[in-house]
Each structure stands twice: as structure tokens, then as C-alpha cells.
From Swiss-Prot:
CDD domains per UniProt: Ribosomal_L22
Function of the molecule: This protein binds specifically to 23S rRNA; its binding is stimulated by other ribosomal proteins, e.g. L4, L17, and L20. It is important during the early stages of 50S assembly. It makes multiple contacts with different domains of the 23S rRNA in the assembled 50S subunit and ribosome. The globular domain of the protein is located near the polypeptide exit tunnel on the outside of the subunit, while an extended beta-hairpin is found that lines the wall of the exit tunnel in the center of the 70S ribosome.
InterPro entries hit by this protein: Ribosomal_uL22, Ribosomal_uL22_bac/chlpt-type, Ribosomal_uL22_bac/org-type, Ribosomal_uL22_CS, Ribosomal_uL22_sf
Source organism: Beutenbergia cavernae (strain ATCC BAA-8 / DSM 12333 / CCUG 43141 / JCM 11478 / NBRC 16432 / NCIMB 13614 / HKI 0122)
Gene behind this protein: rplV
An example molecular function term from Gene Ontology annotations: rRNA binding
SUPFAM superfamilies: Ribosomal protein L22 (SSF54843)
Subunit note: Part of the 50S ribosomal subunit.
Pfam families: Ribosomal_L22
Keywords for the protein's UniProt record, in alphabetical order: Ribonucleoprotein, Ribosomal protein, RNA-binding, rRNA-binding
UniProt GO BP: translation
PANTHER family on file: CHLOROPLAST 50S RIBOSOMAL PROTEIN L22-RELATED, LARGE RIBOSOMAL SUBUNIT PROTEIN UL22M
GO cellular component term, pick one: cytosolic large ribosomal subunit
Protein name in the entry: Large ribosomal subunit protein uL22
Amino acid sequence: MEAKAQARFVRVTPQKARRVVDTIRGKGAAEAVAVLSFAPQAAAETVRKVVESAVANARVKADTASVRFDPADLVIAEAYVDEGPTLKRFRPRAQGRANQVLKRTSHITVIVAERQKEGAR
């Protein structure tokens, strides 16, 4: 069983968010939440919320299908960050000039799936 969660238009740069997402890819869902809870990066909180949402979505999906659900069996199957729209702002500089400031946004996607059994193919 697979479940997906997204956070769109998050005000964190995709480059910084990808650093966080790369640390949890392939880990168990519970382990990923634990790692993100103590990560110093600002994007870690948003990514943690997306992982928790994906686990909750998996629970709802299992309940709807009347299937046994164990959150310990969930693993981060896919996690990626896409670039969202960029907000363009201007900062006043000397001599009447202005520099452009790019405020980047991200779309964070996490897909959790059940861990493959050892004997299964």
C-alpha cells in the first residue's frame, strides 16, 4: 500500500529542502520523523509534517480498504522537492539603484509504502 503527501508553495529554497529530503529517503517512516525532529535545518520541520501526513494518509487508505495497518512497516519510498514559483522582490541600494531578491518556493512530495518482505519477490 502506497500513500502520498505534498506541501506546495513552501517558502524554503528547493536546494536547502533537497538537503533535508536526501537524508530521509529510503528510511523507515518512524526513523525519518525522529531524524527530522532533531535536524537543525529550517526545512526539516516542513518535511517532517509532510512525512507525518503521508503516514496518516496511509492509515486512512488502509482503514478504507479494511486492510491491516502497521506504521512500523512503512518506509519512505520516494521523496523529492520540485521548484515552485519564485517571488521577485527588490532591495534598495546606493545611488538610486535596486537589486533583485529572489524568494524561492518549493513543492515537497513524500510517498510512503510498505516495506518489502524478505521472502517476497
